[in-house]
């Protein structure tokens, strides 16, 4: 499976920017209560049905069933006009769907209304009113799509928080310091029982440019080694004694060059953004602290975007545009751990069986 993930990532060349979005969104409990509702049948077993329905309702309140987890991939290209872009986007869409089939992941393209609903739920996380929209109403009312998805207000007055309507939010970026990454990190982020949106903006680097870049770094490190050796000779001590950092960086750069040249690895520039929202400042701080604790556990640091909250918010919606210039270079295998599309959320409607509490 992991090899298929790597092949999936290697499909994207330098002309395609793609964004992976993982959205934890609180849903209305009334919706779930309607699904698990057991109607009386006017027979001798109605008492049992009532007791069973009461137990299900109690378990629903205990679990994390009110949290809906969604996963999206958004891709974008540069083109002179929409006529030129459309056939390219359709071809890329077809290739991505085929790659998902190889991974065993059911996927489908979203239509315009579904994309607008995602924006509506992102900008109005605590509003329980259902999203209602049709393109015919735009003609009758003179409104545009922004009027249907926007909250009552946006306020970006503070340094590291913002406000959408009655909701307070903050965008942070993940500083990846760990030498090795594990897929458990992303899984723990997505298990947080809070409103959270994780976005990964990924840009593939042209293979020749990546190899040339790493070669130049190796040359720079070798030049620094020679300078240190000259200093050692002039100072009268062993020229083989050089700073340990140079040996470490030199070895890592050579391994990276070998991976790019002979192990089917590509280089990707990754921006990892986290959007936390809550009703109060205290709840927001608690949610950010919980998220930062998971990052710290895996030797990464979650840092708030200072004076870039608006750009961070616009980069946290699935539109395929990244306004944050903070990027980390990762290889294919390091990036592949952020592709958890092989896990599937299960929710069975109709005549289903109760198994346990999640």
State each model region's role.
Residues 1-341:
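Extended, folded cores of ATP/NTP-driven motor/assembly subunits in large transport
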Residues 340-357:
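N-terminal pre-Walker A segment at the start of P-loop NTPase domains
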